[in-house]
Amino acid sequence: MAKVSSAYLKFALVMILLLSVISAVMSAGCIKNGGRCNASAGPPYCCSSYCFQIAGQSYGVCKNR
């Protein structure tokens, strides 16, 4: 088995922690089902990843598909 430098291991650990924090922040900022959303706008997004919006309306509703 090849030796891995401690600097590489530290870097990998920091990257994993950073990605975990980013993922937690992004999921915490989502809109729950029943909340208002805009399918064509940016964050926050629906937790279900689906915004039901009828054409011509300014907002939609987060729901499961």
UniProtKB/Swiss-Prot annotation:
Residues 1-27 form the signal peptide. Belongs to the AMP family. One of its GO terms (cellular component) is extracellular region. The presence of a 'disulfide through disulfide knot' structurally defines this protein as a knottin. SUPFAM superfamilies: Gurmarin-like. It comes from Phytolacca americana (American pokeweed). The lineage of its organism: Eukaryota, Viridiplantae, Streptophyta, Embryophyta, Tracheophyta. Disulfide bonds join C30-C47, C37-C51, C46-C62. It comes from the Eukaryota. Possesses antifungal activity. Keywords: Antimicrobial, Disulfide bond, Fungicide, Knottin, Plant defense, Secreted, Signal. It is found in: Secreted. This is Antimicrobial peptide 1. One of its GO terms (biological process) is defense response to fungus. Seed specific.
